[in-house]
Structure formats: structure tokens, C-alpha cells
Amino acid sequence: MSRKPFIAGNWKMNKNPEEAKAFVEAVASKLPSADLVEAGIAVPAVDLTTVIAAAKGSNLKVAAQNTYFENSGAFTGETSPQVLKEIGTDYVVIGHSERRDYFHETDEDINKKAKAIFANGMIPIICCGESLETYEAGKAAEFVGAQVSAALAGLTPEQVASSVIAYEPIWAIGTGKSASQDDAQKMCKVVRDVVAADFGQEVADKVRVLYGGSVKPENVAEYMACPDVDGALVGGASLEPESFLALLDFVK
């Protein structure tokens, strides 16, 4: 089963619209062929319309970093998935460990968001990952498996097959520590095996599983060599055009 590699940058809460536009203009014409690899960037809500306009006609996909699960209503400060679709958003990141930790998002919240994203014709990038404590206790597979099952509950097999699931060990995010190649492969296979158990092997063979956690141009190729790693969700190394483009060099 051939799955197209996907390198997705996550700017987190960085860049104003002017800086965001300059970034897209610097990378848009230099991206590899969309037949070889999918390139995307998850940007702050205030940058979305600017980035979508600047990326038009290029191979760059645009992701929101979060959404609410209702399309409209009295939800002050939230972002409508319906409006995200209307402005041209391709993907939505949900369940990032920073959202789970700082904003107390639950597996149930993330599942509702996944359903809302699909209902509005976009694709979720569903994040999962364990703490250092869970990892050292030898419970990473059990913990991450439960997160994945909960996030996908009630979705159709077709929806799950088109989903992107990003495994990010919390202890490796922004710390400079990264999981070994063996750890990344083992845990991305855990994710795929959970999908197979819940939705069947055919669906599991289609879902794209990304690794995230201190991925850099220097180590991306070793992760991409793993059979169950289909791409990367990248934080700090996606902030500069040169570094972002270098992440895509593994396809050469």
C-alpha cells in the first residue's frame, strides 16, 4: 500500500500575517512535486486567510491549529469548522498535547472535533502521545492506543482511512530530545495496529501516521525510512523557509 508522505509544519503561536505571507512566498515555488510528497503548514487562526491566499496555486496545504465542534453559536473565542472550510482550510490539527495539557481538552472533545471536521469537508490531523512518566512505566502503547481509539470512535471507515494521525511523545516536543528510530517505528505501528483492530487492515493500510517531536532536517530521513512512518509533524524546524524546505529534501 503506497501512502503519500506528508510533512506538516506547526507554527504554534508564532508569526503575524506579514511574516506568514513572506514565509509562503519564500517556499511556494520551491516545494517538491505534489506527486512525491504533500507539504503543509498549520498556522495561527489570525494568519489563515493570509496564508491561504498566498498559497493559492502552489502545492502548499494549509491547516488550522484547532477548531470547535459546533458550526456557530454562543461560543465566545472559538473557531467555527464551517468557516474554516469556507475560507479554504485543508486540514485541522486536533488533540495536540499543548491543547490537552494547557486547555484540558479531553478525548471526547477531540472525537467531537474530528466528526465536525469531516462534516465540513476537511481532514483532521489527530495528535496522540504519552508523557515521560507513561513512557518510562512501559505503558506508552496502551496509553496511545486508547487515545487513538477514542479519537476515531464513531467515524466511518472511509473517514478514518483519509485521516492523518500524528504520534508525538510529549517528552520529545520542544525539548531537543527525539525518539529513536526504533521507538518512532514501534509507536507508529501501534497506532496503525489500533486502527486495524477497530476498522480493519484495509483502512489501517491507508491511514497516514506521522511522527512528531524534535524533528529536524538532520534526522527527518531516518524517520521517513521507517515502514510505518508516513511523514512528520514539525514545530520549531518549520518556522524558517530554508529549514522547512530542507525537511522535504528526503524525497530526492
From Swiss-Prot:
* Catalysed transformations (reactions): D-glyceraldehyde 3-phosphate = dihydroxyacetone phosphate
Q: Identify the domain of life.
A: Bacteria
Active site residues according to the UniProt entry: H96, E168
Instruction: Please give the SUPFAM superfamilies that the UniProt record associates with this protein.
Output: Triosephosphate isomerase (TIM)
What does it do?
Involved in the gluconeogenesis. Catalyzes stereospecifically the conversion of dihydroxyacetone phosphate (DHAP) to D-glyceraldehyde-3-phosphate (G3P).
Task: Give the species this sequence originates from.
Answer: Streptococcus thermophilus (strain ATCC BAA-250 / LMG 18311)
Instruction: Please give the positions of the paired cysteines in each disulfide bond.
Output: none
| Record keywords, A-Z | Cytoplasm, Gluconeogenesis, Glycolysis, Isomerase
User: Per the record's keyword annotation, is Isomerase included, yes or no?
Assistant: yes
Localization terms from the record: Cytoplasm
Q: Does the keyword Ligase apply?
A: no
Cited PROSITE patterns: TIM_1, TIM_2
Q: What is its main location?
A: cytoplasm
Q: Give me the segments passing through the membrane.
A: none
Question: Which residues hold substrate?
Answer: N10, W11, K12, G174, S214, G235, G236
Entry's Gene Ontology cellular component terms: cytosol
Q: How does it assemble?
A: Homodimer.
The record ties this protein, via InterPro entries, to: Aldolase_TIM, TIM_sf, TrioseP_Isoase_bac/euk, Triosephosphate_isomerase, Triosephosphate_isomerase_AS
What name does UniProt use for this protein?
Triosephosphate isomerase
Q: Which family does it belong to?
A: Belongs to the triosephosphate isomerase family.
